[in-house]
């Protein structure tokens, strides 16, 4: 009767319940077994019970009217995102310039049983997080000097120490501040950090001497240093049982048949692809902190350390303390152990272009005690790097654009923006050759530092104050790319050298990538000055505190100037995509036998030297940033008159591959190669191949600046293999040269300090590689030792001398041939050469 009164949905529902769920009591009694199934649990625990009963629940949770404990309940934020003291050290007066006071793997130090955060971390496998650190010192008023604290993603590698300001950093100046705070996001080649088995450190904190530590008489020869750190935005994944060893010990370890254009972004673009489909790759800045790089002004607008000089008490009023050429190539910071040349970020970028223009910005940061007093005058004299300025007096210098700085007070830094004043629209990069024509100049003027008021101080403090000189640029425009690794030796000890550049994007607007604020964003009276002349606007940023990250980003306007006008170029040569859209040399190899294959990895690692690593421009570029993701375009040039059949294929990292850098018979099947994706070609019908290498990787990104195991696993983009057949080595020569370029879908994240010039590794030419044994000659060299000496000799001769030398050798060989021939007895040839016959 009940069933008859139920509606349709009630009938269907009870039927399904009878089939899928619990039986009624009568059925349980009939089958002599309980028929109750329950699925219970919480979070990542599930329990399925076949003989379950309902939960016995009595009452509910109640809040306390009178709190038993008034602290906030424990949570991931209170336990995992609080500051912990991870390191203590002493900064000593014996520490030299650039001495590394501390080098800390912040994450591994936070993963410590002394810290509450480990209670969360040790039960999880993966995590994503940011890091925030505080570095504290406790100097006295009688101590002076400075430290730089920089958070470096991955590893410092061969990056320039003078360009540490490119990284997230803080500057400690004994006279200005005693604490710095740095907050960084998650920057990693993988989607998450593996606590149990890390590939490499995520963030490395380096603390180095930026200005040497000096003390007064009777003052302690040290100051204490403490480092606090915490996780931010902590995400934990992969609950795991507790094991005995949670972390391993760290260890370190489109073309035509005959013509191909490698010159520009459009013509070097590949039309064919190794990808499964003509697919595109979506942008993903999630592991790069959202800092995507598109323009070289990301580096040139950051002040980096170019030089250092001392303001001594012995300097008299009007004495020239320092003369600096106004060009972007100037840098003087070196180190002898190891031998390093610390290039500035500005010089590193500008050395790769032929011409430059723009406004150079000099930041002069002083390191006094509170008991030092004195003034410096800065002026610039228009001209070039060859002008003589030693005779210009202090009074004469006031005629030129100048600024005077009081070294003592709450502001530590004079920002001196030198406007573009020149007789040519652009200046030349004269460092790429040794001889110059009159009118080919690099610098636009010279900047002179004078003693304006003598340095005074008590006798119990140091009798000098050190001044750091930083260099950057505004409105920088560089054009006409080239490859050049500058050597600081051409400048050190002589202030007549120089270097400078400008940008062809919208003028007078700094690159927003570095987060430069506008003057309107700066609050407080400290950022506003007064001028004695009414109606004249005070210069913005002429005096600042470079130790403060916000004040350091003020756009400098030391002197009035006009806008530079419209660039003559329709293409921005400082665009990362335009510059690296041009194909750059990667490697070359020669086949010496038939039915062989050759595999070469495309690696970004800065520890792999050419010819098995990226050379010159590629090496420099891929170490300018931390993360790369996206496809690459490969151009293969075939050299030699051959009729050879070939096949090429691309292998993503982690799969089976033939031994790299070795010419050998392939151990892989044709099925495997074609499944990966292959192209077939014939060298008689084509002289070049342009192909797009897909972004096929199990990683989020790859990087060239990693430490430990990460340098091996996370630095390789993929591997390219070429196999040949029908090759007759005895009378044919077959060589391949490979060139690499970026694509419109390439992405570059998080800037790094540029490579030192000594780590650039220029490519060797083919003959040098054969002579060094790296490559086997394609054919037996028919030349004798005497032939080689002769060729080596004539290569060193100018053209006129070369012709005379060749003429002598021809006469010599002619005489030898005549003397060796057996001539018949001479006959008289009557009238053969008479005048009548010749006519």
From Swiss-Prot:
Span list, region Involved in P1-2A pentamerization: 766-836
GO MF annotation list: channel activity; structural molecule activity
Biased composition (Basic and acidic residues): 780-792
Region Disordered, residue ranges: 55-76, 496-530, 773-792
Residues flagged as site, Important for VP1 folding and capsid assembly: 769
Motif (L)YPX(n)L motif positions after renumbering to this chain: 167-171, 200-205
GO CC terms, sorted: host cell membrane; host multivesicular body; membrane; T=pseudo3 icosahedral viral capsid
Family note: Belongs to the picornaviridae polyprotein family.
Composition bias, Polar residues: 55-66, 496-510
This protein's name: Genome polyprotein
Superkingdom field: Viruses
GO BP terms: monoatomic ion transmembrane transport; symbiont entry into host cell; virion attachment to host cell
Keywords: Capsid protein, Host endosome, Host membrane, Host-virus interaction, Ion channel, Ion transport, Membrane, T=pseudo3 icosahedral capsid protein, Transport, Viral attachment to host cell, Viral ion channel, Virion, Virus entry into host cell
Site description Cleavage, residues in chain: 23-24, 245-246, 491-492, 765-766, 835-836
């Amino acid at each position: 009767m009940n069933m008859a009164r139920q509606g349709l949905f009630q009938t269907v529902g009870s039927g399904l319940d009878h089939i899928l769920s619990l039986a009624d009591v009568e059925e349980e009694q009939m089958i002599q077994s309980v028929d109750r199934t329950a699925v219970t649990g919480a979070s990542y625990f599930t329990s399925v019970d076949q003989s379950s009963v309902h939960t016995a629940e009595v009452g509910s949770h109640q809040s306390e009217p009178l709190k038993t404990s008034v602290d906030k309940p424990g949570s991931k934020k209170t336990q995992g995102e609080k500051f912990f003291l991870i390191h203590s050290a002493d900064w000593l007066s014996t520490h030299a310039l650039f001495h590394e006071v501390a080098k800390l793997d912040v994450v591994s130090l936070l993963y410590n049983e002394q810290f509450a955060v480990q209670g969360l971390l040790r039960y999880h496998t993966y995590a994503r997080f940011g890091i925030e650190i505080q570095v504290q010192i406790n100097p006295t008023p009688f101590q002076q000097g400075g430290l730089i604290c920089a958070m470096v993603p991955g590893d410092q590698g061969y990056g320039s120490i003078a360009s540490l300001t490119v990284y997230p950093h803080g500057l400690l100046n004994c006279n200005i501040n005693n604490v710095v705070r740095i907050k960084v996001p998650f920057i990693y080649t993988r989607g998450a950090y593996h606590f149990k088995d890390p590939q490499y450190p995520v963030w490395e904190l380096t603390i180095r001497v930026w200005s040497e530590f000096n003390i007064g008489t009777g003052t302690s020869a040290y100051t204490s240093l403490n480092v606090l750190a915490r996780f931010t935005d902590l995400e934990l994944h992969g609950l795991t049982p507790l094991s005995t060893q949670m972390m391993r010990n760290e260890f370190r370890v489109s073309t035509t048949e005959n013509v191909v254009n490698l010159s520009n972004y459009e013509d070097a673009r590949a039309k064919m692809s190794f990808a499964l489909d003509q697919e595109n790759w979506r942008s993903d800045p999630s592991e790069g902190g959202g800092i995507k790089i598109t323009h070289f002004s990301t580096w040139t607008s950051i002040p980096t350390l170019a030089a250092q000089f001392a303001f001594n008490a012995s300097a008299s009023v009007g004495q020239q303390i320092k003369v600096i050429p106004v060009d972007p190539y100037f840098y003087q910071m070196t180190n002898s152990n190891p031998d390093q040349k610390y290039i500035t970020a500005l010089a590193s970028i500008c050395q790769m272009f032929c011409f430059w223009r723009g406004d150079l910005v000099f930041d002069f940061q002083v390191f006094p005690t509170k008991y030092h007093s004195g003034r410096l005058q800065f002026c610039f004299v228009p001209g070039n790097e060859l002008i003589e300025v030693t005779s210009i007096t202090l009074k004469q210098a006031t005629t030129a654009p100048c600024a005077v700085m009081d070294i003592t007070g709450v502001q530590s830094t004079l920002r001196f923006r030198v406007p573009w004043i020149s007789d040519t629209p652009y200046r030349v990069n004269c460092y790429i050759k040794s001889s110059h024509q009159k009118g080919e100049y690099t610098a636009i003027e010279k900047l002179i530092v004078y003693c304006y008021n003598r340095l005074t101080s008590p006798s119990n403090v140091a009798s000098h104050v050190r001044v750091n000189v930083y260099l950057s640029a505004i409105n920088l425009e560089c054009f006409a790319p080239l490859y050049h690794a500058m050597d600081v030796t051409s400048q050190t000890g002589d202030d007549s050298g120089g270097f400078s550049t400008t940008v062809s994007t919208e003028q007078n607007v700094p690159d927003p990538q570095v987060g430069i604020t506008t003057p309107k964003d700066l609050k407080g009276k400290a950022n506003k000055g007064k001028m004695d002349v009414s109606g004249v606007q005070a210069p913005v940023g002429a005096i600042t505190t470079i130790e403060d990250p916000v004040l350091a980003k003020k756009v400098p306007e030391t002197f009035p100037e006009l806008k530079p006008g419209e660039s003559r170029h329709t293409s921005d040569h400082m665009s990362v995509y335009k510059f690296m859209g041009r194909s750059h040399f990667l490697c070359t190899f020669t086949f010496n036998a038939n039915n062989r294959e050759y595999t070469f990895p495309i690696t970004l690692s800065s520890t792999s030297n050419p010819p098995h690593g990226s050379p010159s421009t590629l090496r420099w570029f891929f170490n300018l940033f931390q993360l790369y993701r996206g496809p690459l375009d490969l151009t293969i040039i075939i050299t030699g008159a051959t009729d050879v059949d070939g096949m090429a294929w691309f292998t993503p990292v982690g799969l089976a591959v033939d031994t790299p850098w070795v010419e050998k018979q392939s151990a892989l099947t044709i099925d495997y190669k074609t499944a990966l994706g292959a192209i077939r070609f014939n060298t008689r019908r084509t002289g070049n191949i342009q192909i797009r290498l897909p972004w096929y990787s199990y990683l989020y990104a790859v990087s060239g600046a990693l430490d430990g195991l990460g340098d091996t696993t996370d630095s390789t983009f993929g591997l390219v293999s070429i196999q040949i057949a029908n090759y007759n080595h005895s009378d044919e020569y077959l060589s391949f040269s490979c060139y690499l370029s970026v694509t419109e879908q390439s992405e570059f994240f998080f800037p790094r300090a540029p490579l030192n010039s000594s780590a650039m590794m220029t490519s060797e030419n083919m003959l040098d590689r054969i002579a060094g044994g790296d490559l086997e000659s394609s054919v037996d060299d028919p030349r004798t030792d005497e032939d080689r000496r002769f060729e080596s000799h004539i290569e060193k001769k100018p053209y006129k001398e070369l012709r005379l030398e060749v003429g002598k050798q021809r006469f010599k060989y002619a005489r030898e041939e005549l003397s060796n021939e057996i001539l018949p007895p001479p006959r008289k040839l009557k009238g053969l050469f008479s005048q009548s016959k010749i006519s």
